[in-house]
C-alpha cells in the first residue's frame, strides 16, 4: 500500500503513514526465527519470507526494545527466543479467531521451535476449528479439561460475529525480570475463578547461562491465596 501510493506520487496522509509503520513494526516484533508468526489467537503456519524482503527494502529498523505488544511478551537471550501470551481476551465483536490459551507460550532454540502453541484451524472442519481454540489445545495449564473461554454456538450470532466468545477473564500482575541470571516474566489470570475458585500463575524465564528454559505453574485459592497442592 505504502509503495503503491509512493509510486503513484500521491499525497500520503500523515495518519496513514503512521498506521502503516506501526503495523510493519508489529510484524517485525512478532516474526519468529523460522520466519513465521507465533501460533496465538488466529496465528497459523504462514511464511513471512517474501514479506520480510519487502520490509528490508522498506528499510524499517526492527524495534525489539519493547517487551510486550498486543498482549504478547517477547524475550530473547543468545540463541533463545520466548513468546508468552499475557493478554486479556478481545472484545466479543473481534473474537472470532480467539484461542482460549491464557499464559500459553512458544519457545525457540538455535532457530528451531522447541515448544509450540496450537495454530488456528484454517480450511478444516468446523469441529476441528473449534478444537484448535479450546484451552486443552494450547500450551497452558488446564483444570479438569475445562476450556477457560466458552464459544458462541448460536448460528445467528456466529453469522454476524463469527464464532465469538461468550465469557471473558482478566490477566494481571505482570512482573518482568531481565538480568544476567534470567530473562522472562510472570503473570496471573482468573479464568478458573468462577468454576474452581482459584487463580493460575505462570512464571517462565530464559536462563542465558545454560541455554535453558525455566518455568513453574502455581494454582492459588482465590479465597485465601493458599497454594493448592
Model-identified regions with their sequence ranges:
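Short acidic-hydrophobic sequence patches enriched in Asp/Glu that either
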Residues: 15, 19, 43, 133
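Long, well-ordered core segments of solenoidal/helical folds
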Residues: 18-35
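Glycine- and aromatic-rich loop/turn segments at beta-sheet edges
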Residues: 34-43
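Catalytic and substrate-binding regions of extracellular carbohydrate-active enzymes
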Residues: 49-229
